[in-house]
Amino acid sequence: MTYWNRRKKQQLLYIFVDILSSLLVWGCFLIFRWMVYDGRVFSVDTVFIPMFNFYTPLIAYPIGCIIIYYLSGYYLRPLRKPYLRELLRTFISAVIIALGAFFIFIIDDPVTQYERYFMSLIVLFALQFLGSYIPRWLVTFISHKLDSDTPRTYTIHNMKEVELFEQAHSIEPYDEVILDLNSKTKEDTIYTLINRLYPLNVEISIVPSLYDMLTGAAMIDDVSDQPLIHITEHKMSDTELCIKRAFDIAVSAIMLVLLLPLYLILALLVRVSSDGPIFYRQERIGLHGLPFEIIKYRTMCLHAESATPQLSADNDPRITKVGRWMRKYRLDELPQFWNILRGDMSIVGPRPERRYFINQIEEKAPYYCMIYKIRPGLTSWGPIKVGYTDTLDKMVRRLNYDIVYIENMSIKLDIKIMFHTIGVIFNGKGK
């Protein structure tokens, strides 16, 4: 089982445990209220009246807990969570959950003594914090004790050891590769090595040089860890990354529904304009250097790329009249909201390329692999600054802008890029 599959398995396990613990917490909280405020454990009146305050939280409370924990970034790295960071995140999440439940389900209850409101809030927080942290700690502890869930790490010191790792990895997959290279190793060699490792589904880290440590590039997850530069990780915080993904899901789902009439009209125009399918599917390289199938409206004649892949150019005879109009306003990209919803892409991120062109770009810019650390996007800073890329030099320029975006990515920057993209669309600057 690969590292990313194990991460997914562990994420689902934590979500399942959190759902059970949140139900248990709410049940214990109700029992506390019945015993303390009513003087009895169960009562027909308190159980069934009001029904909203009893039945609704059984569904809403676990869902709310999972949403808060997801947005906190708790599920992002289930196999590598420093205990202090996990404790702090659980504490803050428990505060937010307790306050939310208090104002939604508790504050409208008829209470004659207002100190009981405060007592209810404190008890709910304590139950939520302990009821979530203890089960999580047990799951983490047991997972680390099991050999099958112990992260496997391989250290590479030079290019010759890459083949040895590939052979070992094919027999029993590793989770992380640490590059402990000689300080005289050339940058091109390092990037070539990283490009070779990315498709193997492993986390990649580099032992930093003195310069990296002085400039703050090296990071540690725990006081006992070795300082490393995590190549496959990004600059966004876990919370920001989860908010970004939640935003992608919400916006793509809304756009797919609201723009359904436009989707149907465009599909009809493509169908009557030329022979061939409505949609054009093509393999692109995305997150972690893995291939996925991108979806677009077909804007070219059938079999336009039957031989060697080509970049589109001004007055390209392969583009249909309807296709040229759609490209002008970027309408051919609308089906990619399905790619975003599915998790192949993000709204903002480097544009994905075909392997054929990536191989050519890497000859001029061997650091292309650095964009594999995030999902490719519908738009990014590179396409805004460079526009459509009809030459290899423009593709390298776009890559450089995308690298700068990755090093400075934030929710605020994503919003700015989206507004700039809207301006590009309405000005009809596509081609």
Predicted feature locations:
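A hydrophobic, helix-centered structural microdomain
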Residues: 240-304, 339, 411, 416-431
